[in-house]
Amino acid sequence: MAKKKIHIENSVRRLRFNNDEMTQEQLADLVGISRQTVVAIEKYKYTPSLELAFKIAIAFNKEIQEVFFINQ
């Protein structure tokens, strides 16, 4: 049986702009990652660890499922 890959999407870019147009650098500093990692997350090229996903959600004062979700 072939495993179906789960595609996780996110609303990080939208949340940054809705949060006083937070820069990628500001978010990176808040959660302890590089700006390049923020770019990769926003472009769906990198799926963050569960711990990092929670840190990002907390940075926006959101529940994790409001930031990261499965698109089927």
Question: Which sequence ranges carry the predicted segments?
Answer:
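A detector for short, charged/polar N-terminal pre-domain segments
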Residues: 1-7
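Short, charged recognition helix plus adjacent turn
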Residues: 2, 68-72
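Short basic helix-loop element that most often maps to the first helix and adjoining turn
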Residues: 11-30
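Residues in the helix-turn-helix
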Residues: 26, 37, 66
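Recognition helix of helix-turn-helix/homeodomain-like DNA-binding domains
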Residues: 33-47
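DNA major-groove recognition helix of helix-turn-helix/homeodomain DNA-binding modules
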Residues: 51-66
